[in-house]
Every structure is written in structure tokens, then in C-alpha cells.
Amino acid sequence: METLESELTCPICLELFEDPLLLPCAHSLCFNCAHRILVSHCATNESVESITAFQCPTCRHVITLSQRGLDGLKRNVTLQNIIDRFQKASVSGPNSPSETRRERAFDANTMTSAEKVLCQFCDQDPAQDAVKTCVTCEVSYCDECLKATHPNKKPFTGHRLIEPIPDSHIRGLMCLEHEDEKVNMYCVTDDQLICALCKLVGRHRDHQVAALSERYDKLKQNLESNLTNLIKRNTELETLLAKLIQTCQHVEVNASRQEAKLTEECDLLIEIIQQRRQIIGTKIKEGKVMRLRKLAQQIANCKQCIERSASLISQAEHSLKENDHARFLQTAKNITERVSMATASSQVLIPEINLNDTFDTFALDFSREKKLLECLDYLTAPNPPTIREELCTASYDTITVHWTSDDEFSVVSYELQYTIFTGQANVVSLCNSADSWMIVPNIKQNHYTVHGLQSGTKYIFMVKAINQAGSRSSEPGKLKTNSQPFKLDPKSAHRKLKVSHDNLTVERDESSSKKSHTPERFTSQGSYGVAGNVFIDSGRHYWEVVISGSTWYAIGLAYKSAPKHEWIGKNSASWALCRCNNNWVVRHNSKEIPIEPAPHLRRVGILLDYDNGSIAFYDALNSIHLYTFDVAFAQPVCPTFTVWNKCLTIITGLPIPDHLDCTEQLP
């Protein structure tokens, strides 16, 4: 509060600003203090109005005045509002730093105001102190005059009486140029309050003016709007501030934890080094003692050998000086044997003396450990992996996901997450929903195969790289399973149809051998049909049929209960796209709908969405939609084909094309 109070203090009077002026240099000054500055610059016979400039007492910037003098400077209304609120807070606050001084000032002002507010109705001189001010009459009264002028009867009982206040507060804002006139309009040109005379005969007569109420509503609305935006912005800033403070707290806590961990780990390393130092030092001492003991023994042996040899050498030299042959031969034989024995014994000691017992091949090489210590650093979470969609593979119920990592050496394990993709809009929400994800933890390689997936379904995959410091996830990757693969069932083929060895092509063959009758075989004359070897009861599936010159065929699906003696589409248990020469129709329950304009099909695409109940036919080569059946499936369905001429070839186990994938079309 003391710091704020110093900011609200006038540099001249050292009191809180009163009626502050906003100077062009952005500093403020009390109106009366500015007036006193002008008076101080006046010569003896010079008026204040003749002063056209003065210096700001704060920054010494020269303030140039207009013809209006100080009245031409704008009031610092914002500063005045802050001072008013500060004064209220200071008076009401029991622990205000300037409470005592403010109480004295408040009491003094009260006494001064009480002395100055005199009765305006008294005939006495001086007038008595006013006890009430009548807002209705705009007059202050002493007790005696109040009783005389405001008896307790109408209309005086309707007058509003308040504690005595100065006359200027009763009468409202007065015009700066016409002291006896109240301001009652607003000059838009000068952005100033004026009276009627200013508009009629004053310098504002040619200016654009507006009613106070109009300007009031506009300014109030603008202020309310700005205030709302400011409050909203402050709320956002407070939320951001709270998050920043919370983040700072987390940083402090985590940093303290890491510092403690660092100290603990370094102390442990130092302890290990000291232990190793002690162990290696002990080994060195033991090695030194052992080697010195051996060397001491060798030294003693050498000395003993030298002493013996010296005595023998002396005797031998003495014998060599003997010139008497008989005497020489008498002593030389014994001496020669002793010299030979001494030479042999000294030769035995020589290899031991040359043993490597000087520690010259012993070395302390800690260069590798030093490099490791120099590389010590805190561990961070690994970089996010990247899913390599071009390397990923899929079948109708499996997807093998491949990914790469920039810092694979720092990864302890990977975690694979996946879920069904239901549209672009749900990617973000799915990432925030843990319940919808399947999780495969503790993967050590850069690939993984997920089994048991739905066929013809798109999935979102994310890979998380994990180490002791944390984890980071890859961007979502979208992969989809293929459709259910199937082949033609030869046991169901009509006797006049021939199925290829790979069970993928069927053709009309009048010369086909007779086939045994089975319940699943098409039998009726003209119903030259063959079924697939699967029954589908869930998921989305897509396959294509290559038209190899046939001009009379039907392609569709049927329940297991569909009659084998009828064409497909002729009953309620089958649906078909048919070509009869140049006529193209879709057929169900004997109801035919023509396809117009007639397509020129070389390959037909069939999209079955069992769960959502639809069978759609497409021109596969030109990506043109032909027709869609909406079906509430009651039983599993089987792909079914009828051919009256030439042949048809099926291509199955395909992924659903992107332009047919409804999930790609969601917003």
C-alpha cells in the first residue's frame, strides 16, 4: 500500500492527487499545483492567462498550453478513480500504512467542511453552520432555518435532506467557460462537456454536439463492453497464472527431487570408486609384499653365492700361481670340481633374478570409465517414434505395425495402442480416452503384429517409447484390415458351370461332367449359380468381380436359406446386380430397379457392411456408385454368382478403397 500511495502522490504538494491533470509527457499534476506553477511564473503586472508554457516538475518536459490554459489539458479521470478507491480502502482498512494520518486528514476535512458549509438562508452575519442540505431546494440550512422553511407537511415532506455538503456538490458540474451554467450537452469535436451558451454563442457553435444521454449510453455501453472483455481477459490470465504457478511448483518439486537423486547417485558412485580404490590398493600392497619377499630371498641367495664364489675364486687364483706340477695336480682337481659346482648353482639362480617382479607391466587404465563419467547427464524421455505406414502389412484379421525411433538406444520398451477409427473428428477425443484403447505393453522390437481384428475395418495406432525418465507417443497412424477372403465353393456350383482349379473363376460349360446332387448345389434349369465358401455375419467387406466377356450374369449375396432352384434376387433371401444382354437391373424379392444410364462394366465392386445393413455395387474401374440396398440382416450372408455365358473371376481379401470408406467422409 505504501508503494501504491507513493505512486499516487503529487510531486509538488506531496499529497494524493486532487483533480489531476494528464500532461502530454504522460505525468500527472494537481490542477491547483499546476495553477500555482503558472502563478509563480507571472511577472508583477502579468495575468496567469498570459503564461503559455511550463515545465513538468517530474521530467522537465516543456508543456505548451492552448488558449484555454490549464482547462485545455485533459483530466486524468482514471487516476482520480484509482485515488478514490484507494482512499476508501485506506480508510476502511485497519492496518493501512497511513491509517493514522488519513484519520487525522479525514477529521480535519470533516471539520473544515462543517465550518465551510454555512446556512444559506440565515439573516445573521456570520451565518450559522448548516445541519442539513436540501437536495430538492439546492440550499443548506441551519437548524432554525430548516424548521422555518421545511415544516412537517406537504410538499416539504417530499424534499430530500442529506448531511450538509458544499454548494458546488449540490448544483452539479458547471460549465468551465460560463460559470453560472450547468453542462447539458457534449461537444463531440473537442470531446468535452459544454453548456447551451457554448453551443449558441461560444467557440463550440460550429462543432458537432450530442445529448448527454446519448453520449452517456454510448460511452457506458463501450465501457461495459471493454470491462467485460477486460474481466474475461483477466479471468483467462488468472487461469493461465494459476497454471504457470502450478507449473513453477512442479518444476521446483521435480528439480529438487532430481537434485536429491543426483546427489544420491553421485554419492553412490563416489562410494563405489572409494571401495574399488581400497580393493585395488590392497592388491597392489599384497603384490608388492609378495614380490619384495621373493626378491629379498633372491638377494640373500645371491649374496651367499657371491661370498662362496669369492672364497673359491681366491683359492683357485692361488692354485693357478703354483708352478710345481705335482702340487698343482694335487689341489687343482678338488678346486676344479668346486668351481664347476659353484658355476652350476649360480646358473640356477639367474632365471629367478630376471623374473618380471617390478610392476613394469602393471597399469591402471581408467580411460573408458573416465569417458563414461564425462558423459554423465540426466536422462530424458525418448523422442516420439514414427509409424512407417509404408512398411505396415495387413490381412483380414491382422495388422503388422512397423515404426522407427531416432534415439532407439535410450528406449527401454515400446507400448502399442490401437482402437477402431470412427471418423476424423474423434481422433483427439480418442487420444484423451483411455477406456477406448487396447494396449500391448513391453514390446522390445520395432514391429508388432496385432491379431483378432475386425475385417475391413480402419484402426488408429499409436506407439509410445518408454524409458526411466518417461514416455512420448507417436503421431496417430491409420491402418485398415483387408476384407474377408473367400473362394468359390465347387460343391455348390450348377452342373453346367465349371470352377477353376484355384476356385476363383467360374464359366458356363455345357460339356461339364455330371456332378452328384448335394443340398447346397444350384439345380434349377437356368439358375446357373455358384456360392462362395464363407458366410459373413459381421464387419465390412469388399471384393471385386472381373467380367470376362459375359453379357448375362448376376452378382450378389444370399442367405443360406435362399432357394437353390431360383435365380438370385427372385426371393426375399437374396440381392443381386444383374445384366441381361443390354439391360442392367438390381433385383430383390422379384422387384427390379433399372440402372440408368446403362454402365459398361468390366469390373464390379461389392461393398458389404453387415453391421450397418447395406450392400453397395460399384463400377470398380471408374469409381462410380451404381446402387445400394439397405438391409436389416437376419442371417449370415454368402457371396453368390450366376453366369449364363462366358466367365466371371472373383478377387477377394481386398482393403476397402479410400473413396468408399465412409469414415473418411466424416467431418
Swiss-Prot record:
One GO-annotated biological process of the protein: negative regulation of microtubule depolymerization
Domain COS: 320-379
Subunit structure of this chain's protein: Homodimer or heterodimer with MID2. Interacts with IGBP1. Interacts with TRIM16.
Zn finger intervals (B box-type): 116-165, 172-212
Signal peptide: none
Tissues with expression: In the fetus, highest expression found in kidney, followed by brain and lung. Expressed at low levels in fetal liver. In the adult, most abundant in heart, placenta and brain.
One Pfam family it belongs to: zf-B_box
Annotated disease: Opitz GBBB syndrome: A congenital midline malformation syndrome characterized by hypertelorism, genital-urinary defects such as hypospadias in males and splayed labia in females, cleft lip/palate, laryngotracheoesophageal abnormalities, imperforate anus, developmental delay and congenital heart defects.
Modification Phosphoserine, positions: S92, S96, S511
Chain positions recorded as Zn(2+) 1 binding sites: C119, C122, C142, C145
B30.2/SPRY domain segment(s): 482-659
EC number: 2.3.2.27
Organism: Homo sapiens
Main location (coarse class): cytoplasm
Protein name: E3 ubiquitin-protein ligase Midline-1
Record region (Disordered): 471-524
